[in-house]
């Protein structure tokens, strides 16, 4: 009887009847009468009129009980009427009369086979072949039953014996396709894929419409990674059998993997097309939906990414990776509660999912929940002890908590595991700026060695088409991720607004992760003045370098340094003839391709001993120009008038508030009776951080009841108004405040700062001097204390200064955007003229590097393993914009099916799992 999916009845009569052979001789008269009756019976039987035919066969046998042909015909009718035992009696009788009757023997075999007696069936077919080797039906049916025997043996665990039976079947009938097919199945299970493929190909050659063979050929090609060949096999299969569900599912898998392959090779649009085609074959295939989410995330189409991640979860509620990646998208959109919900859902599916544990720690770090963050990141490390970026994020957490030594150790642990971690390498450089003085040369060497290694990861342009005409209009490019409500934005606004665009055309390269109203205002201003605005978030740094060259930028200015989302990889390519670093980082970048670093004579005095890779260019006044927030609100009276006591304060981050700073502050507070200290910092929403801070001050003699600790304030207006809580602002050292100092002064709060030997220490010196408060710049810790005490001693003078300070600041060079920009343009013009005269500091520097012999000692002081090969890594922000702190680079991770890549969007989709739908047909095909 026929078996589903295995039909090899070609060459047999349509009613399944085996041609009979004539029986023994009969008397002439009987033979004539019987022959007519027998012929009519055969006609009735061929028309499926078995009852009528049976009656005629009986009539013949009543007259001639030895008529073999009638016995065979009767047996066939009985078999058709589901009377196998009576039928086999007829066939056996025919064999008794004519032992060499191949037809009767073959029908005996058919009944044995239908009754499940395969061995007896095979013996009957073999006897038929022996009786008449030319009788083809016997050979064909023997091949069938041998194939069935082979399958039975294989299923019983006797694989070798099963293979032997398949081979015997092919010896009997070398054209029997199911035997080849089932051999292919066995060899596939034995992982002998070359043999399996040969067998499937022979099966398809013998039976061109063998859908299952094409399907399983596709599985082998798919598992070998030959996706195009696999897809071609599945297409052939589905042409034969359009509703073959296993083949459709396999096609969806192969197309999904091909989509990932071409996406990784750089053709993301074709990858998306393959993912969508996969859904045509299997509309509920969650892996294709997941990878579409990944692709749309990489294309920055986050709305579509969300749609497909949610679809993936609908069809596969256990897809923890989709939950994780949704969380990353919501995190980047500042929807932290939703992000936490997604990460927690991922962890409910995979409790030890290190990426989601890490990402939850990232969110808690951003929120200042340091204990919870530490717990999550430590769990991520426990789940995966080689998870390098978790150590990077632990370093960021320690840095935010003010534990710089622990932060550096965590970064170095990350670099031990992954020497290529760009985030940890750069975060380490940033953290070293918080360490006390006496470290300057080692800090310089750390930056310099990082820059030399980083440079090797990028090809450098060595020629430019920019015309060397000294006084022609210039194109100035500004590259930054901080064109939103962020500390850098308060200092870049003046040039964007006041540049003479006819002579200094501005091209903005904006890497903003999430644009806000300030972003849109900047963009509108630049475009209306005739500039160009390019959004480069998510674009590879080498591609950004190509854009810079296309835009014919003459001077490219980077505003980020080693803080989050920087484009130092673009600067390493040297796409512009002149390259500059400014504002975003308080030290050298260490990158040899950057010509100049913009500063002033107060932040970096001419006699400074601090070393820089770049050549210093000092602006005529301050190197900073502050554009106050329109949301600041009015200046309030100094609170001491109503309070009756002085309140000192600082809104700098904890990393800047070193133990030495706390010692000096405690000395001031202890010297001013009833005075209070207010400190605002993100981690102060964490009880353990608060208690540690208060305990430290208590050890220094300052009662905790005199200290107010405020957590992060999200709204900019409320943040600015919080300055009304303090009478006097205390700056930090050796890493002084920048935005916080400007905000303090703008809100009428005088700030006491201290000069030092490095730029980071002297930013407050520059700001206060240019505002007209040079008298508040101390040269020592003792003088710092004295200046603070002098201010606190005269509340009336403090009030007068407070109410006049905003006006004083507005008239100072620090807020004079027009004149500041003219000075900046003059500096740019001088740089350009030097270039036209053949003087480019970076080119000289690069030539010298080419001449340096290679050192065998890769371990420089404080620069172990700072290789940054992942040059297109981007990092999460740490601090809120209004705090004005430099941001370390947090790395959140997206998990993928099969692979994880480090990237800020956390949407790293690659190959989907293999679920090869192998079809195993067992050769039961007789009827």
Curated annotation (Swiss-Prot):
GO CC annotation, single: cytoplasm
InterPro entries given in the database record: Glycosyltr_41/O-GlcNAc_trsf, OGT/SEC/SPY_C, Sel1-like, TPR-like_helical_dom_sf, TPR_rpt
EC number: 2.4.1.255
Pfam families: Glyco_transf_41, TPR_1, TPR_16
Pathway: Protein modification; protein glycosylation
Swiss-Prot/TrEMBL keywords: Gibberellin signaling pathway, Glycosyltransferase, Nucleus, Repeat, TPR repeat, Transferase
Location in the cell: Nucleus
GO molecular function: peptide-O-fucosyltransferase activity; protein O-acetylglucosaminyltransferase activity
UniProt-annotated stretches for the region Catalytic region: 422-927
Main location per the UniProt record: nucleus
Keyword Repeat (UniProt): yes
Catalytic activity: L-seryl-[protein] + UDP-N-acetyl-alpha-D-glucosamine = 3-O-(N-acetyl-beta-D-glucosaminyl)-L-seryl-[protein] + UDP + H(+); L-threonyl-[protein] + UDP-N-acetyl-alpha-D-glucosamine = 3-O-(N-acetyl-beta-D-glucosaminyl)-L-threonyl-[protein] + UDP + H(+)
Top-level taxon of origin: Eukaryota
UniProt record, GO biological process: cytokinin-activated signaling pathway; gibberellic acid mediated signaling pathway; negative regulation of gibberellic acid mediated signaling pathway; regulation of reactive oxygen species metabolic process
SMART domains, per database record: SEL1, TPR
TPR repeats: 34-67, 68-101, 102-135, 143-176, 177-210, 211-244, 252-285, 286-319, 320-353, 355-387, 388-421
EC main group: transferase
Residues covered by region (Disordered): 1-31
Described purpose of this protein according to its UniProt entry: Probable O-linked N-acetylglucosamine transferase (OGT) involved in various processes such as gibberellin (GA) signaling pathway. OGTs catalyze the addition of nucleotide-activated sugars directly onto the polypeptide through O-glycosidic linkage with the hydroxyl of serine or threonine. Probably acts by adding O-linked sugars to yet unknown proteins.
Family from the record: Belongs to the glycosyltransferase 41 family. O-GlcNAc transferase subfamily.
Name of this protein: Probable UDP-N-acetylglucosamine--peptide N-acetylglucosaminyltransferase SPINDLY
């Amino acid at each position: 009887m026929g078996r589903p999916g295995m039909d090899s009845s070609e060459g047999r009569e349509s009613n399944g009847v085996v041609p009979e052979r004539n029986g023994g001789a009969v008397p002439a008269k009987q033979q004539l009468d019987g022959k007519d009756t027998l012929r009519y019976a055969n006609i009735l039987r061929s028309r499926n009129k078995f009852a009528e035919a049976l009656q005629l066969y009986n009539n013949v046998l009543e007259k001639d009980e030895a008529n073999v042909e009638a016995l065979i015909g009767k047996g066939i009718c009985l078999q058709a009427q589901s009377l196998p035992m009576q039928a086999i009696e007829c066939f056996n009788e025919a064999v008794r009369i004519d032992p060499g009757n191949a037809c009767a023997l073959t029908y005996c075999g058919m009944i044995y086979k239908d009754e499940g007696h395969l061995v007896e069936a095979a013996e009957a077919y073999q006897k038929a072949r022996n009786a008449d080797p030319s009788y083809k039906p016997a050979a064909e049916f023997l091949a069938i039953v041998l194939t069935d025997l082979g399958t039975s043996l294989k299923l019983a665990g006797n694989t070798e014996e099963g293979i032997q039976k398949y081979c015997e079947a092919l010896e009997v009938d070398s054209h029997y396709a199911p035997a080849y097919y089932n051999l292919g199945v066995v060899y596939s299970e034995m992982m002998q894929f070359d043999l399996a493929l040969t067998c499937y190909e022979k099966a398809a050659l013998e039976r061109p419409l063998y859908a299952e063979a094409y399907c399983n050929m596709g599985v082998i090609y798919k598992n070998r990674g030959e996706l195009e060949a696999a897809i071609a096999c599945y297409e052939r299969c589905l042409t034969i059998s359009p509703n073959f569900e296993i083949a459709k599912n396999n096609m969806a898998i192969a197309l999904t993997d091909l989509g990932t392959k071409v996406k990784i090779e750089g053709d993301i649009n074709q990858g998306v097309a393959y993912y969508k085609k996969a859904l045509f074959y299997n509309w509920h295939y969650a892996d294709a939906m997941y990878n579409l989410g990944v692709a749309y995330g990489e294309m920055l189409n986050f709305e579509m990414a969300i749609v497909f991640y949610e679809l993936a979860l609908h069809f596969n509620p256990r897809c923890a990776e989709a939950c994780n990646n949704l969380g990353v998208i919501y995190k980047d959109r500042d929807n932290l509660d939703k992000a936490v919900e997604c990460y927690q859902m991922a962890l409910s599916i995979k409790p030890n999912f290190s990426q989601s544990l890490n990402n939850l720690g990232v969110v808690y770090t951003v929120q200042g929940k340091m204990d919870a963050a530490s717990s999550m990141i430590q769990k991520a490390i426990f789940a995966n002890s080689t998870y390098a970026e978790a150590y990077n994020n632990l370093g960021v957490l320690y840095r935010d908590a003010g534990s710089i030594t622990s932060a550096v150790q965590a970064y170095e642990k990350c670099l031990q595991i992954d020497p290529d971690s760009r985030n940890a390498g750069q975060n380490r450089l940033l953290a070293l700026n918080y360490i006390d003085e006496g470290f300057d040369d080692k800090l310089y060497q750390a930056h310099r060695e990082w820059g030399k290694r980083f440079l090797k990861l990028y090809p450098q342009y060595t020629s430019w088409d920019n015309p060397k005409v000294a006084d022609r209009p210039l194109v100035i490019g500004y590259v930054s991720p901080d064109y939103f409500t962020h500390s850098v934005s308060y200092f870049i606004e003046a040039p964007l607004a006041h540049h003479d665009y006819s002579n200094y055309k501005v091209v903005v390269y904006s890497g903003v992760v999430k644009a806000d109203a300030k972003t849109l205002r900047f963009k509108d201003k630049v475009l209306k003045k005739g500039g160009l605005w390019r959004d480069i978030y998510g674009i590879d740094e080498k591609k950004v370098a190509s854009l810079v060259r296309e835009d014919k930028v003459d001077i490219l200015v980077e505003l980020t340094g080693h803080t989050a989302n920087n484009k130092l990889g673009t600067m390493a390519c040297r796409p512009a003839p002149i390259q500059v670093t400014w504002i975003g980082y308080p030290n050298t970048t260490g990158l040899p391709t950057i010509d100049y670093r913009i500063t002033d004579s107060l932040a970096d005095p001419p006699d400074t001993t601090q070393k820089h890779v770049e050549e210093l260019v000092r602006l005529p006044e301050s190197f900073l120009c502050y554009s106050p927030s329109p949301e600041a609100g009015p200046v309030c009276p100094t609170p001491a008038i109503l309070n009756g006591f002085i309140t000192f304060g600082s809104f700098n981050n904890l990393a800047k508030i070193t133990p030495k700073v706390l010692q000096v502050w405690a000395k001031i507070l202890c010297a001013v009776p009833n005075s209070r200290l207010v400190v605002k910092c993100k981690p102060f929403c964490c009880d353990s951080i608060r208690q540690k801070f208060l305990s430290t001050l208590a050890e220094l003699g300052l009662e905790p009841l005199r200290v107010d600790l405020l957590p992060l304030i999200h709204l900019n207006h409320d943040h600015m108004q919080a300055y009304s809580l303090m009478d006097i602002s205390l700056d930090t050292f050796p890493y002084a405040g920048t935005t916080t100092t400007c905000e303090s002064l703008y809100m009428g709060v005088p700030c006491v700062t201290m000069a030092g030997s490095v730029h980071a220490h002297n930013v407050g010196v520059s700001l206060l001097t240019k505002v007209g408060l040079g008298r508040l710049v101390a040269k020592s810790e003792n003088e710092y204390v004295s200046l603070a005490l002098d201010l606190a001693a005269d509340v009336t003078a403090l009030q007068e200064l407070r109410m006049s300070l905003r006006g004083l600041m507005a008239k100072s060079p620090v807020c004079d955007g027009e004149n500041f920009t003219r000075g900046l343009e003059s500096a740019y013009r001088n740089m350009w003229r030097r270039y036209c005269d053949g003087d480019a500091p970076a080119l000289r520097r690069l030539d010298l590097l080419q001449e340096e012999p290679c050192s065998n000692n890769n371990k420089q002081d404080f620069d172990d393993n700072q290789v940054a090969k992942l040059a297109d890594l981007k990092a999460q922000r740490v601090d809120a914009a209004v705090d004005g702190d430099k941001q370390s680079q947090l790395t959140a991770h997206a998990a993928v099916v099969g692979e994880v890549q480090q990237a800020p969007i956390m949407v790293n989709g690659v190959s989907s799992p293999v679920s090869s739908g192998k079809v195993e047909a067992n050769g039961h095909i007789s009827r």
